[in-house]
């Protein structure tokens, strides 16, 4: 399984990547909207772990673009935004799950 972790906070991104690699997943990472967009366009992922607030753009915009392209990647949002409205918005846009930070 190939996973893309999109998170701008370096230490959190590294912890997530290491944890997934320890479970023997193939993991790549991106720290900005642009870097994530390029990787998503160039590679197929089975799962994308996606922060909402990114330098250069919103993770929700990436989510909308992925779903508009009918990409079937599993998408898990990770965000410090923890209101019911934020969670409903993410799930309504096509996320498969929504996890709040810290976790």
List the model feature ranges, each with a label.
Residues 1-103:
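N-terminal/domain-start alpha-helical segments
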